Amino acid sequence: MNFRLLEKYDPKAFEDEIYNKWLKNNVFLPNNSLFEKFSMVAPPPNVTGVLHMGHALNFVLQDILVRYKRMKKHNTLWLFGTDHAGIATQTVFERNLKNIGKSKNDFEREEFVKEIFKLKDKHRGVIVNQIKKLGASYDHSRERFTLDESLCKAVNKVFKDLYSKGLIYRGEYLVNLDPGSGSVVSDEEIEYKEVDGKLYFVKYFIDDSSFIEIATTRPETMFGDTAIAVNPNDERYKSLVGKEVTIPLTTKKIKIIADFHVDSAFGTGALKITPAHDPNDFEISKRHNIPKVNILTQDGKLNENVPLQYQGLSIKDARFKIEIELMEKGFLKGVKKHRQQVGHCYRSGEVIEPYLSTQWFVSMKPLAEKALKALESGELRFYPKKWENTYKYWLSNIKDWCISRQLVWGHRIPAWYNIDTSELIISDTDPSLDEKNVGKRFVQDPDVLDTWFSSWLWPFSSLGWPNITVDFENYYPTKTLITAYDIIFFWVARMVMAGLEFTGQTPFRDVYITPLLRDKQGKKMSKSLGNGIDPLDIIHEYGSDSLRFTLSFLSVQGQDLNIDAKDFMLGAKFANKVFNASKFILLNLENREIFNNLKFNDIDKWLLTSLNSTILGVESSFANYKYNEASKFVYEFFWNDFCDWYIEISKIDLNSENVDIQNMAISKLLFFLKKALLILHPFIPFVTEKIYSEFSEKGDILALNEYPSFDISSNFKEEFESFKVFKTFIVAVRTLKSEFNISSSIEIDVALKFDSDFKYEGYFKANESISKRMINFKNIFYNENCDGMLGLAVVGFEIYADVKLLIDKTKELIRLEKQLEKYKMLKISVSKKLENENFLMNAPKEIIESEKLKFVEFSSLINKINSYIINLKNL
C-alpha cells in the first residue's frame, strides 16, 4: 500500500480542499433515516458582522456535537442563518452613505431598503465564509435569513395572533431612545458604564427672595419639569408643599408636591420631576396626575418645547450653554464632580435618553408564566444548572416588551391607519385592496419590529412554520441550543415563550451556556478593550483544528475561559502529533500485506479496553455537555495510550525478522489508527479526514463513518489491569532516570522484589521485551539481593536500580535537600492562604480550587523527595 501524505503538518494545504469535499458529497445533509433525530439551530450572526472569538467558541462547540451525533447515525440537521440586525446593519449603511456625502433622506423608503439588501448580499458572504473556516457542518441548502419571505410570513402571523389576543398593544410610554439611530431600544439592549459627570445645584425661585435648591445631573431637562417633589416627612420643605416655583431661564411656573419616593438624603432632598425623560418621574407623574413635556427630538436634539436659543442643539451643547447662562443669571449655586452609571446602547454605544413616545408593546407576563412552568416541569434544562436562576429572575421580573423601532431596515409593522378616521387594521397588505374597504385610504405604520421579534421565532420559522412542512414535522422541536449567557433573556427565554405560545412545545430541551471568554488578566474580551483574539489569525497561524481542539479542551462547564493566543499551541501540538503518528504508520504500510483477521495479544486487549473506556467517557461527557472532559478522553487515549505506549511497543514487532509478525503489527496499528481517527473526528475534522483519505477506499468519507460504540466483546478487564500495573514499573524507572539526570539511552541494571500476594509476576516476566524497550535496562533480576541499589516502593512490589556509578551521591543529596526546602516553603505559603478566612470568602472559586490542588501537589512532591533522600543515604 502506498500513500502521498504531506511531508509535514500544513493545514493551509488541505483544509479548504477538505471542506469543499464535504460539501460536494453532501456530508452535512440529514440522512432522513428512521434513527433518532437530532436537530439544532445556530444563533444567527449579524449579516454584516465579522467573526470574533465568541462566535468561534459557539460554532466550534456546536459543530463538535453535531458531528458526533451525525457519526452516531442520528438523523441530524443543523440549521444556520444570518440575522438582518436592524440597528446594526442600518447604522453601517448610513455610515457608508455619510462617507459619500449622502443620508437616508436622499432615498425613498423602498429604494433605501433595496440598497441595504445590496449591502447585505455583499457582506453576508464574509461572515458565512469565516464560519466555514471553522469547519461548521451546517446544512447549506437550508440556510436562512431573518428577512426571507417565509420568515416574514411567520413574523406577521405572530403579530396578528398576539394582537387579536390582546397581547400586543399601542400606547404612550417612557422608552429608551438611542439618538444615534433615532430608534428606541429595549431595557435589555442597554449596558451601563461608570462615567465622570457633574452634579449641578440649581435655584428654583419661589419669589424674588426665596428659592428651593435642586441637585441634578441633567440641567438641560429642566425645560421638561412639571413639578418639584419633596418627601412629606422632610421638615425643611413641609411649609413649601403646594407653592409654585419658576423654572430657571423661563417664566413657566410649576408646583411643589410631596411624594414618599423622594430620598431626603440625596442632593438637597428636593427632586425636579421631568416625567417625559425619567422613569421614576414618570411614575410620580401618574400618581399626581401632572403633565408630561417632551423636550427632545428623535435624533436627540432639543425641540420646540424649550426656549428658542436652545432649540436644535444637541444635549451636550445645550448642557454647556445652559450651565453658563445659569451661572451668569444667578441660578447656579454650585457644581461638583459626580461619578455615575449612565446607560449606553450596546449596539451603537450612544448614551440612552429616556423618551416619552407612542410605541408598540407585547404584554409579556402571560407568556412568561408558561415559560417558567416549562423549567419547573423539567421540559427545559440548563447546563450549567446555575443559569436557571438567571432565566427565572428575568421571567419573574419581566416587563412589557417595546417591539417598535424607528428604522427602515427590518420587518415593517403590519399595522395600517385610515387616513381619514384613524381606524387601525392589522394586515399583511394594504387594507384598501380589500373590497370591503373600497374608497378608504390607509397608510402603513412607518416603524419596524425589534430584531429579536423575528429571532424569537427562529427554531420553528426556520423550519417553514406557520406552514406544517416536512422539516417542521421531522425536526421540531430541536434538541439542544448552544449559546452565550448574555442572550438568555434576549433570545433564549423569548424563544421558549414563543415556542410554547405558537407550537405548544418548548423549542428545545437542553440549553448549554458557553463559557465567558476573558483574557489572561481576567478581563472580559471586548472590542472596546481591544483584548480580543481574532480566530482567523489563529486559523492562519495554526489551522482550524488547532483552534477547535484548544477551545473544546479548555471549555470547562460553568467556568470562564481565560485565554491568550499562545494557548492555541495546545491544539496545534495535538493536531501535529496526530499527523506525525499517522504518518509513521502510513510510512510503514509501504510494501506490507494488510491482514483482515487480526490476532490480539494482551497489549492489544489493553488498548481495546482503553478505547472502550474512552468511548464511554466521550458519550457521558457529551450527554452532559462537558466538552473539556470529552476532549481529554480522546487526548489521553491518542497521545498517551496509543502513541506513547502502543506505537512504541509495536516497534518491537515492526522490527522483527519475521515478515508475518511485521505485517500483523502494522495491520493492528492501521486498525487502531482508524478507530482513533473516528473518535477524534468531531474535534479535529480536517486533519483526521485528510489522513483517512490516504488509506481508505476511494469515496469513503470519515465524517460519514459510524462513531465507535462500546463493545462488550472487546472489554478485557484482566489484561487492562495487568498492563496498568506493568506501566507503573516502567514509569517509575523512567521517572528515576529523569530525576537523577540519567539519559534514557544509558542501560542500567534493574531488580524487582514482588510481594508474596503479587499476582502479576508472570506478566512482568512474559513482557521483558517491552520493559527493555521502554526503560532500556541492561539486566533485570527478580527477587534477588539488591544491596547497593537505589530502591523505590510501589503498590505490590519494590523497584531497585543500579545507579551509584552514574550519579554523584553528595551533589544529588544537596540538590534534593534544596528542592525539599523549596517545596516545603511553597506548601506553607499555600497553607496560610487556605487558612485565611478572608481569602476563602472573597477569592474566586477557581482560584481556591487551584490553591487546594497546589497543596496536594506540593505534599506529594515533598513525600517523593524525602523518599529519594532516604534511599540515597542508604546507598
Curated annotation (Swiss-Prot):
Q: Which reaction does it catalyse?
A: tRNA(Val) + L-valine + ATP = L-valyl-tRNA(Val) + AMP + diphosphate
What is the residue range of the motif 'HIGH' region?
45-55
Q: Which domain of life is it from?
A: Bacteria
Q: Which InterPro entries is this protein grouped with?
A: aa-tRNA-synth_I_CS (IPR001412), aa-tRNA-synth_Ia (IPR002300), Anticodon_Ia_Val (IPR033705), M/V/L/I-tRNA-synth_anticd-bd (IPR013155), Rossmann-like_a/b/a_fold (IPR014729), tRNA-bd_arm (IPR010978), tRNAsynth_Ia_anticodon-bd (IPR009080), Val-tRNA_synth_C_sf (IPR037118)
Q: Place the motif 'KMSKS' region on the sequence.
A: 524-528
On assembly, the entry states:
Monomer.
Give the protein name, as stated in the record: Valine--tRNA ligase
Give the organism, scientific name.
Answer: Borrelia garinii subsp. bavariensis (strain ATCC BAA-2496 / DSM 23469 / PBi)
